[in-house]
Swiss-Prot record:
It comes from Homo sapiens (Human). This is Ran-specific GTPase-activating protein. The keyword Phosphoprotein applies. Changing E16D: In a breast cancer sample; somatic mutation. Residues 1-26 have a biased composition (Basic and acidic residues). Transmembrane segments: none annotated.
Length: 201
């Protein structure tokens, strides 16, 4: 037993004498990859509104239709700098996966969610969160009623802006259509006069 103690004492387990300068745990990558620029397709858009919220979609395809959580993250209202189109975009917090992506149209209407002053419900004809666009009934819930009201105010401003822009574009299209119709009438009259002139000769 004494011999076992002696051998244990002789064995030095301390790390004081080891030279740390020889240890260099630096690894070179096997394959070098060039840095890639990541595009979110938000570069050409101006951020009008951004706030944290939780999004739900109404799953009517189930046997028992119910609200299903789609994600928690920042909801944004983005306006395209050239086209002027405004869309609602929401990404999940950690994965940054899109959970809502659709244009705001004049027909959209935010309705209060039953029993809550901090949630809104609305319909969209084409939500692009999944691979293919599909109509959705969405609900969004904010931290408090004040944040929910801020969202509604900005959403309504955007909706009215789109409505006014479409009215202006619509009246411009009508003016253009009338001008084209007048030109067509003038052309047909000229053709008739040419035909009349040929018949007279």
């Amino acid at each position: 037993m004494a011999a076992a103690k002696d051998t244990h004492e002789d064995h030095d387990t301390s790390t004081e004498n080891t030279d740390e300068s020889n240890h260099d745990p630096q690894f070179e990558p096997i394959v070098s990859l060039p840095e890639q620029e990541i595009k979110t397709l938000e570069e050409d858009e101006e951020e009008l509104f951004k706030m944290r919220a939780k999004l739900f979609r109404f799953a009517s395809e189930n046997d028992l239709p119910e609200w299903k959580e789609r994600g928690t993250g920042d909801v944004k209202l983005l306006k395209h700098k050239e086209k002027g189109a405004i869309r609602l975009l929401m990404r999940r917090d950690k994965t940054l996966k899109i959970c809502a992506n659709h244009y705001i149209t004049p027909m959209m209407e935010l309705k209060p969610n039953a029993g809550s002053d901090r949630a809104w419900v609305w319909n969209t004809h084409a939500d692009f969160a999944d691979e293919c666009p599909k109509p959705e009934l969405l609900a969004i819930r904010f931290l408090n009623a004040e944040n929910a009201q801020k969202f509604k105010t900005k959403f309504e401003e955007c909706r009215k802006e789109i409505e006014e822009r479409e009215k202006k574009a619509g009246s411009g299209k009508n003016d253009h259509a009338e001008k084209v119709a007048e030109k067509l009438e003038a052309l047909s009259v000229k053709e008739e006069t040419k035909e009349d002139a040929e018949e007279k000769q």
